Amino acid sequence: RYEMTDVTVNGTQAPITGLTILDQTEMLAGFGDAQSIATESDYDVLLPNFSVRLEITDDLIARGAASSTITRPTLNSMSPVTVITTTRQGGDLTSTSGNPALEPFKSDNLDLSLEYYYDEASYASIGYFRKLVSNFIVNSQEDKTFELADGSLLTDPSTGTNASAPDAGDDVAVFTNTLPNNGEDATVDGFELALQHTFDNGFGVLANGTIVDSDAELDPFDINQVFALTGLSDSYNLVAFYETDDYQIRLAYNWRDEFVQSLTQGQGDGPTIVESYQQLDISGSYSVTDNVEIFFEGINLTEEFVHKRGRFSNHLLLVEDSGRRWAFGVRGNF
């Protein structure tokens, strides 16, 4: 598949007109009338997709797939507007911007699997996956100046001969501007294992696990690190079930290792890490008729807590107690 994308981004920006000394530490930014902004960009991508299925025997099947996929940037990250965030005396000037020229990040994927069906409803499988991801979007910082209506550059009135008022010796106001940019690459690979065994009397068990690795993991000792993959962790699930034509009940245990949720925090610097977590759930249903079903769900039966921390294990950020939750209902299909 070949895709061509034209991007038009519209926004409204009130231009900064000057900085005024407010008190001993702060300055106040003045703004003019809002003006419309429009930017245009384009990009094209080739997205091949190839898959193959090989029946080695009646019970043994091999599968393979190679593909390229893209993930487009969010609309918020493509905003053409610059927001002034800090105007303190002494050169502490910061701002944030979107980037209308952002391109999607691309993933070249390889998936291989081998499945063995040793009974009518029982199988074991192993799979390998590898993803080469390029053009990741990360936040970067650059110096930014602002041009005024008369063509001159905005100055910082706290830097001249008179630190309390504007004068001829004032320096150009240089803001540290944070904005998203393309550029980072990463490799992710891992294995997926699965086993399902069904007994003759309707009982069965299901187990699966994922082992994942990456070359873009968080280094807790590198405070200048600006890129690491989020959401990656090992996990496994164990399910016991009983099924008949009318009844179905499942007891599921889920475990997930700790993972980086975000490279930022709601307050303060540093990453947000979700610690390893386990949960036990139950669900069941009864078919009253071919079209009506009664069901129930029990979530987090053992009332586990979610713990979020910062860079190190003693940097507690949040303990989330969602409790045990039950749901009952009726489903209809007409």
Indicate where each model-derived feature is located.
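Transmembrane beta-strands of outer-membrane beta-barrel proteins
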Residues: R1, A65-S67, G127-F129, L206-T210, ...
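Surface-exposed extracellular loop regions of Gram-negative outer-membrane beta-barrel proteins
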Residues: R1-E55, S107, L195, G202-T210
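Solvent-exposed loop segments that connect transmembrane elements
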Residues: M4-T39, M78-G98, S140-L179, E217-A228, ...
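Outer-membrane beta-barrel signature, preferentially recognizing the C-terminal barrel domain
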Residues: S41, I70-S125, K131-V133, V172-F191, ...
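Residues on the lipid-exposed face of transmembrane beta-strands in outer-membrane beta-barrel proteins
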Residues: F50-L54, L112-Y116, Y128, L193-H197, ...
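Repeated loop/turn-to-beta-strand initiation elements of outer-membrane beta-barrel proteins
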Residues: D59-A62, A121-A124, G202-V205, D246-R250, ...
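Gram-negative outer-membrane beta-barrel transporters
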Residues: R130-L132, I137, E142-Q265, T302
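C-terminal beta-signal and adjacent terminal beta-strands/loops
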Residues: W255-T264, S285-F334
